[in-house]
Regions:
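Solvent-exposed interaction patches of small proteins and small membrane subunits
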Residues: 1-126
Length: 126
């Protein structure tokens, strides 16, 4: 992401990645996921995207992030760093658990934050 976006842009990236993770894991169980390098790579990549977008919000819209503590911005970025910089030691069981438990819990929080961001960035005309 080369150009700084508004918070809504980063949140939209996060939602797209969340949706992709849901599609890539749908119909799979953990055993099938462990056998599919393509699914593993796709999920890992989208976790990285979520984490990078979270970092960009912390950097470019810190006040917004501070108002939305329901989203674990730093934890998301930390997971991205572990995956990106420790690719040879990625624990796929943790990736699976994150994809099927944590990511679905994150989705409504990001959706709500996006609604707020859009209202703040585009206030209604009076």
């Amino acid at each position: 992401m080369s150009k700084a976006l508004r918070a809504s842009g980063y949140l939209d990236y996060m939602l797209q990645a969340i949706d992709r993770i849901g599609r890539y894991t749908a119909g799979h169980d953990e055993a099938a996921f462990m056998q599919s390098e393509m699914a593993q790579d796709a999920v890992v990549r989208n976790i990285e995207i979520i984490g990078e977008a979270a970092h960009d919000i912390l950097k470019d819209a810190p006040a917004f992030a501070a108002r939305h503590t329901e989203i674990p911005w730093k934890i998301l970025y930390g997971m991205r760093n572990k995956i990106s910089h420790g690719y040879h030691v990625v624990d796929l069981a943790v990736v699976w658990q994150t994809a099927v438990e944590s990511v679905p819990e994150l989705a409504p929080k990001v959706q709500n934050a996006l609604k707020v961001a859009l209202l703040e960035e585009n206030p209604p005309q009076r």
